[in-house]
Every structure is written in C-alpha cells, then in structure tokens.
C-alpha cells in the first residue's frame, strides 16, 4: 500500500493553490468580458427590435435612455402626434410607451452603460464619450423611422473589470455595430473579429 509523506502532500497542495491563484483572475476576467459582450448584443438587439417596430407600425418608434438612481433605464415609445418622439410628449402621454423600461444590470449583473476614464473616440468622425455613456444628443433618445433609418449615436457599455464595448447606431441604415476597446493596443475593434 503506497503512502504519501506530509512533505509530498504539502507540495501538491501548494502547487494546486498556486495554479488556482493564477487561473481565478483570468477566469473572472473572461466571465466579465462574456457578460459585457452579451449585454452589448442585447442592447443592439433591442434597438433592432425598435427599428422593426417602426417599420411594422408605419410610425416613428424611439428608445429613450434615462438616468434613474445612478443606473440607466431604457424604454420604447411610439410617436403619437406625427412630430417625432419628444421628451415633452412622453411626459404628457402623447407619445405612448410600447416597450417597458429595462436595465442592463437586471439581465447582466455588474454591467452598466458607462465609459472608462480617458477612453478615446471610436473613430475620427466621433468624439470621446468623456463621462457620458449615452451619446445620442441632449435628449438621450434614438428614433427609428418607418423607412428603417434612425438618428445616429453611440452607447458605451462596461463591466465590473472595465471591459468596454460600444454599440454604434448608423442613421442612414438604422443598423448597429458592436465594437470592443482593446486596452493593450488602445484601439476599437469590431466585436465580430474577436
């Protein structure tokens, strides 16, 4: 019957602890990246759903982002008086709610609309987000038309470990594109290439 000495057992336990200490942070970073990427896809899908709502309803439908208790909520509204979805029309009830309020953190723990400090602009045609992760103009509304076009803008999304993604909305087509910020190179890369 083979037996192990106390020194052999301590060596094996020490090696296992070292491997675990190295692997756990990398595993947590991978989980955070996956969760943040999924949240970016979720946000892009919600925008595309709103675009399809506008086409099928033959009316302008928009997503409004609101800061509530330090977290952003987003909800869909349909134009009620043919002048576009406006904040004052939402408040007065003219533009009615068609998609209930939602929060990224409710589906993806630790993920929010945010921008890490000193984040560069996505490209030469845009500005850096600074402290505003919702780059849709002063109203924080992205509108989609019955012809499939939209207003343009960017939504910055980050996770607990500062994994950074952006959902870009292109006005001429109403389509979205997801990019990830590579901290090593300091560049934005298409999420589809990662």
Where do the protein language model's features map onto the residues?
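Glycine-rich phosphate-binding loop
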Residues: 1
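N-terminal helix-rich module
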Residues: 4-11, 18, 22-48, 52, ...
């Amino acid at each position: 019957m083979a037996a192990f000495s106390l020194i052999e057992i301590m060596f094996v336990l020490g090696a296992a602890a070292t491997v675990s200490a190295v692997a756990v942070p990398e595993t947590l970073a991978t989980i955070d990246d996956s969760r943040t990427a999924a949240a970016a896809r979720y946000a892009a899908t919600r925008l595309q759903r709103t675009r399809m709502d506008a086409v099928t309803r033959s009316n302008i439908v928009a997503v409004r982002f609101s800061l509530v208790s330090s977290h952003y909520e987003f909800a869909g509204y349909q134009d009620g008086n043919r002048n576009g979805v406006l904040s004052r029309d939402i408040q007065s009830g003219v533009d009615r709610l068609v998609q209930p309020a939602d929060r990224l953190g409710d589906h993806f723990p630790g993920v929010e609309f945010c921008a890490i400090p000193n984040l560069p602009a996505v490209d030469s045609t845009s500005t850096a987000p600074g402290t505003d992760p919702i780059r849709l103009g002063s109203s924080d509304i992205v509108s989609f038309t019955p012809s499939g076009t939209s207003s343009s803008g960017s939504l910055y999304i980050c996770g607990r470990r500062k994994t950074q993604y952006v959902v870009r909305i292109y006005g001429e087509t109403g389509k979205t594109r997801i990019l990830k910020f590579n901290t090593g190179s300091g560049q934005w890369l298409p999420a589809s290439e990662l």
